[in-house]
């Protein structure tokens, strides 16, 4: 028996019944705040021939800025609007990832609650090598990577728009996985039949350094 008070200052929690807010979890495509990389945020225009709209957390292919919009011919401020971007169709052409950060022009409706950016609209993104940390959708089976080295190889499923186990036929995605979050996340569910995209609570996200 001891007269000393036992205290573990690291075992903290919220008291019950205080209407507390839990700040755990991430939002797909919403890059984490970082003063050292915020000025690397880039903007461009989604290609007019893009097959689908785009949203945050999607690998993009950046093309050299055209002299006029819409490319390849037309009139307008041209390269002042930034590069032309489109959804990357293969691992070899991924140049960055789209994000929701400061992208206030996304279209939402009562039936489509996640912001979507149509061909010709402005899209914000971070390039590979920028050092941005972006939450990306990941296959729940890859929770098994917890505790592994951050350079563990993974691939991207271009149909399901998520990180999957490494596939030599697809190639390694050029990201480092810093953290995998399994709860309190917001992910985007895009329905190709209706063209709607909605927020889904509870998906699995990986915070990726690009």
What kind of feature is each model-predicted range?
Residues 1-210:
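Surface-exposed, low-hydrophobicity beta-strand/loop segments enriched in small/polar/acidic residues
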């Amino acid at each position: 028996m001891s007269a000393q008070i036992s205290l573990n200052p690291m075992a903290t929690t919220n008291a019950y019944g205080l209407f507390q807010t839990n700040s755990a979890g991430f939002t797909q495509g919403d890059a984490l705040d970082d003063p050292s990389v915020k000025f690397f945020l880039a903007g461009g225009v989604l290609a007019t021939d893009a097959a689908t709209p785009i949203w945050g957390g999607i690998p993009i292919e950046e093309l050299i800025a055209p002299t006029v919009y819409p490319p390849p011919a037309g009139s307008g401020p041209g390269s002042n609007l930034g590069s032309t971007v489109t959804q990357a169709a293969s691992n070899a052409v991924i140049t960055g990832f789209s994000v929701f950060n400061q992208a206030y022009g996304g279209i939402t409706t009562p039936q489509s609650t996640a912001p979507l950016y149509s061909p010709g609209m402005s899209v914000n993104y971070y390039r590979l090598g920028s050092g941005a940390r972006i939450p990306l959708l990941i296959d729940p089976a890859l929770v098994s990577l917890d505790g592994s080295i951050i350079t563990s190889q993974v691939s991207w499923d271009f149909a399901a728009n998520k990180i999957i186990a490494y596939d030599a036929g697809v190639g390694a995605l050029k990201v480092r996985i810093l953290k995998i979050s399994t709860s309190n996340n917001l992910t985007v569910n895009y329905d190709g039949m209706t063209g709607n995209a909605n927020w889904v609570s509870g998906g699995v996200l990986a915070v990726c350094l690009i």
